[in-house]
Amino acid sequence: VSLVFILYCLVWFLHRNTVSGLLVKSINFVVLGKQDIAAEFGKKGTVTDLTLYDRKESDIIKTWVTPSGFPDKIQPLLQAINLAEYVIFHVDKLDKFTGEQIIALDTLKKDKGILSHTFDVDESKLNSMIKGTVVEKYLKVNQDKLKEEMDKIQPISNNDPPKLVVDHCFDVKGVGTVILGKVTNGKIKQYDNLKLYPAGIDVMIKSIQMHDDPVEESVCPARVGLAVKGAKPDEVGRGDIIAQANTVNVKSEIELDFTKSPFYKTDIAQNQGCLVSVGLQIKAAKFSSITPLKLTFEKPIVYKPGDIAVILKPESTTIRILGSGPIK
């Protein structure tokens, strides 16, 4: 057998495996503070209250998500942070919204990140704002070194049972239901039969795309587009989970190991309403008990014990993050 033929076969095998997702790795960043710097890193894609940018570099697909609906709304901030493994925090002003972003990052225990600031930001004041929070642990860089340091960051993956969190869903003519989301655990393969939660609907993965390329499987933490059979777009919502049967909990009441935010000064009372963020889910709830803290939801929530639930009061004129805690 000729050497040329062997080399051809090797190139074909590597290409096939790269395209099928075996060698394609992924990194997801959230860009906070001065969000428009994300445009320098990747090409703009989906735009809603979350804006996504992406770029493929050799065998790594990098995605940057910005909470473009924030600060008008608090909800996209939590959702954008929950979509990322790493944080890029480029501070351009020291106001209550910067404080809110620091509290959100600390609440969600996002301790892997890079911190920079514009020249007009008082560094000592910024340092006092982040003192005692996860942001204090971030790598501090000058803004001109941001990209250089970001390029050193390595992908994080796991081999847990497959799980995907949905962030967008729509109908495509000739294709059907298309779901955009992030593989948070394990790998998802073409023709997998999985469940959509909290509805409990059976879905089959018809096809998978990563960065507009068809692939046979996608490995955590890949961002993917899935064509699915079994669910209509109006049955799918942001925050829904696609996973194997019996690997997640679906309940209408949860108990938290709760810590109230020291910045939220108003008392909480039984039967008071709130919004709760778990992953990408934002659901209306009431305090059914204060000690221990229990929440009752209008619609069931998907979770695993240990997931962080963040309680929000969007109408608050000061801090909109009331408190948080892992779900028991």
Model-derived features with residue positions:
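Hydrophobic alpha-helical signal peptides and transmembrane signal-/tail-anchor segments
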Residues: 2-13
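C-terminal effector/interaction modules appended to NTPase cores
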Residues: 11-86, 91-92, 183-190, 194-328
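Short coil/turn connectors at secondary-structure junctions
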Residues: 24-26, 110-111, 161
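Helical mechanochemical/support elements of P-loop NTPase systems and associated helical scaffolds
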Residues: 73, 97-101, 122, 142, ...
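Conserved C-terminal guanine-recognition region of P-loop GTPase G domains, centered on the G4
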Residues: 77-83, 87-134
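Signal for well-folded cores of large energy- and translation-related assemblies
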Residues: 106, 151-154, 171, 184, ...
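Canonical P-loop GTPase G-domain recognition
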Residues: 119-171
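Short catalytic-site patches enriched in acidic/histidine residues
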Residues: 164-186, 208-209
